[in-house]
């Protein structure tokens, strides 16, 4: 197997959908593995070490929300939820449990591939770049965040969100702009993605998430970096 090919784990009990996803993703140059059970998905992630997980919300064994929560306890692997539900509560629960993004069924294959590529994009040849917000230091090429020498563990998406804010400390970012820059959306989308991930980021980087100094809310507009 080509070691440069990225591996996608598809977790879905719908065999026909899983087969379609496999065909589409392999056609785009990805390796794929398919699991149809939530509990087995946890073992598969440990054994296969995928670069990204496509995770259905409704699964036998363990539902997607619980799978997401368990994975996030010790893994930063990108997770994109697949859901047929339009229920706001389920989407938000999934995001709060650690999913990076979600896509509603039915979806166009090109849209799915774009979401996957947005979560996998990484530049291994990034030049040296050190950023800071308040007392938080960010080593961009090392993908490392510290406060007073203590490392703060972030998922790749949380890291990208923090870097986007830190690179333009005077700019107030609307949610739509963050969706484009961090998630790779090219059209208006669900701004709850931004709100939930800001909450998750604050829980990790703020000394007091209720009184943030790193990621500030600009009421009626969006978010900005706190003062250095």
Swiss-Prot record:
Domain annotation Response regulatory: ranges:
7-120
Give the record's GO biological process terms: biological process involved in interaction with host; phosphorelay signal transduction system; positive regulation of DNA-templated transcription; regulation of DNA-templated transcription
Residues that hold a divalent metal cation according to the record: 13, 56, 59
Lyase keyword on record: no
Location of the DNA-binding region in this protein: 128-227
The record's section on NCBIfam families has: MtrAB_MtrA (NF040689)
Pfam families listed in its UniProt record: Response_reg (PF00072), Trans_reg_C (PF00486)
Give the location in the cell: Cytoplasm
Q: Name one GO cellular component term.
A: cytosol
Q: Please give the residue positions where the record annotates the modification 4-aspartylphosphate.
A: 56
Cross-link Isoglutamyl lysine isopeptide (Lys-Gln) (interchain with Q-Cter in protein Pup) placement: 207
Q: Which InterPro entries match?
A: CheY-like_superfamily, MtrA_REC, MtrAB_MtrA, OmpR/PhoB-type_DNA-bd, Sig_transdc_resp-reg_receiver, WalR-like, WH-like_DNA-bd_sf
The note on cofactor binding and number reads: Divalent cation. Ca(2+) and Mg(2+) have both been seen in crystal structures. Optimal DNA-binding requires Ca(2+).
Per UniProt, subunit arrangement is: Probably a monomer when inactive, phosphorylation may permit it to oligomerize. It can oligomerize, and interacts with MrtB. Co-immunoprecipitates with DarG in the presence and absence of darT.
Q: Which superkingdom is the protein from? A: Bacteria
What more is known?
Was identified as a natural substrate of the M.tuberculosis proteasome.
Q: Which species is the source of this protein? A: Mycobacterium tuberculosis (strain ATCC 25618 / H37Rv)
* Needed co-factor(s): Ca(2+); Mg(2+)
Fill in the PTM field for this protein: Phosphorylated by MtrB. Autophosphorylates very slowly. Phosphorylated protein binds DNA better than unphosphorylated.
**Can you say what this protein is called?**
DNA-binding response regulator MtrA
What turns on expression? Answer: Expressed in culture (at protein level). Constitutively expressed in infected human blood-derived macrophages and mouse macrophage cell line J774A. Autoregulates its own expression.
Q: What does this protein do?
A: Member of the two-component regulatory system MtrA/MtrB. Binds direct repeat motifs of sequence 5'-GTCACAGCG-3', phosphorylation confers higher affinity. Overexpression decreases bacteria viability upon infection of human THP-1 macrophage cell line, due at least in part to impaired blockage of phagosome-lysosome fusion (upon infection bacteria usually remain in phagosomes). Infecting C57BL/6 mice with an overexpressing strain leads to an attentuated infection in both spleen and lungs. The level of dnaA mRNA increases dramatically.
Keywords, A to Z, come to: Cytoplasm, DNA-binding, Isopeptide bond, Metal-binding, Phosphoprotein, Transcription, Transcription regulation, Two-component regulatory system, Ubl conjugation
Effect ascribed to mutating residue 56 to N? No phosphorylation by EnvZ kinase in vitro, does not bind DNA. Poor growth in infected macrophages and upon mouse infection. Fewer bacteria are mistargeted to lysosomes
């Amino acid at each position: 197997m080509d070691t440069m090919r990225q591996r996608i784990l598809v977790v879905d009990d719908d065999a026909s959908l899983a087969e379609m996803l496999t065909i589409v993703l392999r056609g785009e140059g990805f390796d794929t593995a398919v699991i149809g059970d939530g509990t087995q998905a946890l073992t598969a992630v440990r054994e296969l070490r995928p670069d990204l997980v496509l995770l259905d919300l409704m699964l036998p064994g363990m539902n997607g929300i619980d799978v997401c929560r368990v994975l996030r306890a010790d893994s930063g692997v990108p997770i994109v939820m697949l859901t047929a539900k339009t229920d706001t509560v389920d989407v938000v629960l999934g995001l709060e449990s650690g999913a990076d993004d979600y896509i509603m069924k039915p979806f166009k294959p090109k849209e799915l591939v774009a979401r996957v590529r947005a979560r996998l994009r990484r530049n291994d040849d990034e030049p040296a770049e050190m950023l800071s917000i308040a007392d938080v230091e960010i080593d961009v090429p090392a993908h490392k965040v510290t406060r007073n020498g203590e490392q703060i563990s972030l998922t790749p998406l949380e890291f990208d969100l923090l870097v986007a804010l830190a690179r333009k400390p005077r700019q107030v970012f609307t949610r739509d702009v963050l969706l484009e820059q961090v998630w790779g959306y090219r059209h208006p989308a669900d701004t709850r993605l931004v709100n939930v991930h800001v909450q998750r980021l604050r829980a990790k980087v703020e000394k007091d998430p209720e009184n943030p100094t790193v990621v500030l809310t600009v009421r009626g507009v969006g978010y900005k970096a706190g003062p250095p």
